[in-house]
Regions:
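Membrane-cytosol interface motif
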Residues: 35-46
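Short hydrophobic alpha-helical membrane-anchoring segments
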Residues: 16-21, 77-85
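Internal/C-terminal transmembrane anchor helices
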Residues: 61-83
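Juxtamembrane low-complexity tails/linkers enriched in Ser/Thr-Pro and polybasic
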Residues: 44-60
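Membrane-spanning helices that line or support transport/gating and their immediate boundary helices
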Residues: 25-34
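Hydrophobic single transmembrane helices highlighted by the model
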Residues: 1-25
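Membrane-interfacial loop-to-transmembrane-helix junctions in polytopic alpha-helical membrane proteins
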Residues: 2, 59-62
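Sequence-structural signature of mature extracellular/luminal beta-sheet repeat domains
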Residues: 79-437
């Protein structure tokens, strides 16, 4: 049977009237269910986002709290480390020395030309220079840390250099006696030692002579001088330890100003040690007058040179029997050298520090500097290009004859006049620099 268009439309109308409401109801229910599902999913997403935001805020709050606590802890540790941590050499209050007027002495620049230098070899510093029989001798060292440091006594004729003896640690000073023996001040992590070395064509033999005083190890031995009578004078920079070498010990004493440096004399015949001078704020150098009657002592922190009778005993710096031969110096005096013509050469370890002496009557900032470590302390003491590295003064008249400037290194550690030249040694130098006199 054929269904016409009208019949087909009637069938669709009947079907829509019969099934349509159910389909509409089904679609409506499905849409409602879908909307409810979407709403629930949206609520879950919102709840999850709110939960995540709350957790994030809580985590940030905990992190901020932890950061604050950590920062406060670090600050407290830093305050303790720099301001309250116990140190071996607490700073002492002292009166800063005056600064003398200009002397009008002749100005001489240390030559920087490599042709005028005396090369010693691969070394990191020079602590002492002496001359004997037309040859120059220098105490040169290698090794950044004292426990790894070795030192050589190097002899040079101006063209060839050779090490004649070697020691562990730092060879801070040496001097020849009338018999040709070498007296050495040696510094190791265990303390200081006064030694005697005999040298011949077969080599050198080093003998320890003084290793302790009153049962305690020697401190930072800094210099040695032998009198015409054979007495051996040696200086201990300060009572503080010297685990980082002589330069470090001298910087520590400059900051602390404990005035515990001493000068002793050893009698080889009697094998006795006696104190000559105490109360020195950094005994950094020694020299004897040409006749051996007067002993000159560098006082680093007081920026002066003390003069005492070489036969005197148990004196105190600035007290009876001890006079300031040269005071108000423009730098911190170190090594000394007295020429046979009566001229005293004074080397300056560092230039005068205005900051240090401004805080002489206060211990707070100096205590912080002492606790801050070696790198910070090294930056505190420098020498500008125009600052004197050494001066020459007449012992007879007290007239300042010559001022030497232009040493490239920060610390002038050694000075030695030889004929028409003056030779200088410094920390960080592998050669001897020269200037005319």
């Amino acid at each position: 049977m054929r269904i016409g268009l009208i019949e087909f439309l009637l069938i669709l109308a009947i079907a829509s009237l019969t099934v349509g409401p159910r389909v509409a109801l089904f679609v409506d229910r499905w849409m409602r269910r879908a909307n409810r599902a979407n709403a629930m999913a949206a609520r879950r997403r919102a709840e999850y986002a709110a939960q995540m935001a709350a957790e994030r805020d809580a985590m940030l709050k905990r992190f901020r709290t932890a950061s604050t606590v950590f920062g406060v802890g670090i600050l407290l540790v830093l305050v303790y480390a720099l301001g309250f941590r116990p140190i071996d050499t607490p700073p002492q209050i002292y009166k800063a020395p005056d600064l003398r007027q200009e002397t009008g002495a002749m100005q001489t620049a240390v030559s920087t030309d490599r042709k005028t230098r005396l090369e010693l070899g691969e070394y990191q510093g020079v602590d002492c220079i002496r001359t004997k029989d037309g040859l120059l001798y220098a105490a040169a060292w290698n090794g950044a840390a004292l426990k790894k440091r070795t030192s050589d006594l190097v002899r040079t004729d101006g063209g060839h250099a050779a090490a004649i003896l070697s020691v562990e640690g730092e060879l801070t000073g040496f001097a020849f006696d009338a018999a040709g023996d070498v007296w050495l001040t040696q510094l190791t992590t265990a303390g200081g030692t006064l030694c005697r070395a005999k040298h011949d064509s077969w080599g050198a033999a080093v003998e320890q002579v003084v290793t302790q005083l009153d049962g305690a190890p020697l401190g930072a031995v800094s210099a040695v001088e032998v009198s015409p009578a054979g007495k051996v004078y040696f200086a201990v920079a300060a009572a503080a330890g010297a685990e980082n070498g002589l330069e470090s010990a001298l910087r520590t004493e400059l900051l602390a100003h404990t005035a515990t440096g001493c000068v002793y004399v050893y009698d080889p015949a009697a094998r006795t040690v006696e104190k000559v001078l105490g109360g020195v704020a950094g005994a950094a150098g020694l020299a004897l007058s040409p006749d051996g009657s007067t002993l000159y002592v560098s006082d680093l922190g007081s920026r002066c040179i003390w003069a005492v009778d070489a036969a005197a005993r148990e004196l105190t710096a600035g007290g009876r029997g001890c006079t300031a031969a040269f005071a108000g110096l423009p730098g911190y005096p170190g090594a000394l050298a007295a020429d046979t013509d009566g001229t005293l050469y004074i080397s300056y370890r560092w230039a005068r520090s205005g900051w240090l002496e401004k805080n002489a009557d206060s211990t707070l900032l100096r205590g912080i500097a002492l606790r801050a470590g070696q790198n910070t302390q090294e930056r505190l003491f420098r020498r500008t290009a125009d600052a004197p590295c050494a001066e020459a003064v007449s012992l007879a008249t007290g007239a300042w004859e010559q001022t030497f400037t232009g040493l490239a290194q920060d610390s002038c550690a050694a000075v030695c006049p030889v004929e028409s030249k003056v030779y200088f040694g410094a920390a960080g130098a592998d050669s001897l620099l020269a200037a005319n006199r």
